[in-house]
Amino acid sequence: SLSVAFESVIATYNTNVGCGDVVAINANTGTYKATRSAINSFNTVPISSNSAVGTLSRDRLELWRSDLVRTIEYGHVEAPQEADQQPHPDCALTSALTRMELLAITDLCPDSITDGVALRFMSTTPEDSRQPEIKQSIDLEPHSTLVSIGQTAAAVYTPTTPAGTARITSFNQQGKELNAATVPSSPLLDGTAPTHHEDRTGVTTPQIADLPHHMSWFDGQRLYLFEPENLLISHIFEGALGTGIAVGGQLLYPNREGIAVADWNTGKILRVIPVDRQGYDGPVSLNQAGHTIIEQRDDTYVALN
C-alpha cells in the first residue's frame, strides 16, 4: 500500500510474514528516510494523519511516527512478548481513523451480546506501544462505521430503517453523544456504488479530506462538511463525485458537469467550471500541486490548467 505523511511517501510491501516491510522516501529528494520490518497482516490498507501513519487490517492496526518507530499496535499479535497486553485480541476491526493524539476504531467482537459494533477511543502514543490505553468504549448498532474524526471526537454512520436512510452520530472521547442526524443512505456504505467500501481487507476505508474549517467525507453521491470540534454536519453537497480542496477561501469539488465552486460558509454553489472527462463517469477526487488542480480518476491523474 502507499500513503503520504511527514513530507514522505510511505510504501508497505508484502513479504512471507505479511505487509510488514515499510520504506519512507523523502518526497522532495527521492532519498530513503526510514525503514522498518516486522510481522503484519497480509491484507492491509494505509491509515494516516498529519501526526501518524500505519496500516489497518481486519485483525490488527499499527501506527508509526515519522521515523517509522511503532507508537501503538491494537488487535491480534502473532508472537506476544507478554500476556494480556491487548484488550481485545479476538475482535475484528471494521474501521479506524486518527488525528493528532486521538485514535478511534470500530470493531466487532465474538462475545458481543447485541451482535453490534463497539467504538473505542484511545491515545496514539500509550506508554507502551504494545499495550493500548482505551479511554472509552461505546456500543453501537450493527454495521456502524467511522466516517470522520476530529481532535477530540469521532462521527459514525449507522444504517437505519426504513431502507434508504441512515444516521450519523458524533461522540466525544469521553463517550458523550454530541450530535445525531438522519441522512440518506450512502451508496459507498450500502454496496450500491461501483466501488464498494470493503475490499479484500474487509475493513471500511472512508473517503475523507481536510479543509481549513471543516472535515469532509464523500459518501458515494454527496460531500459532507463537518465542523471540526463537535463534528456537526454543516453542509451536504449533492451530486458530488468525490472529495474536494480549498482554493482562494472557497471549496472546489468534482461533479458531473466539472468542478463546482462553493461557499463553505453558506453551502451555496457559486459556479461550475466545465471539465471534459471524455466519457469517464466514475469517482473523482481533487488535489492541488502548486497552482495546478489534479483530478484523480480511478487510477489516472489528470492535471487541469
Please give the residue ranges for each predicted region.
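C-terminal closing repeat unit and adjoining cap/tail of repeat-based domains
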Residues: D219-I233, A246-N305
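Acidic, serine/threonine- and glycine-rich low-complexity intrinsically disordered segments
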Residues: E73-G75, A79-F226
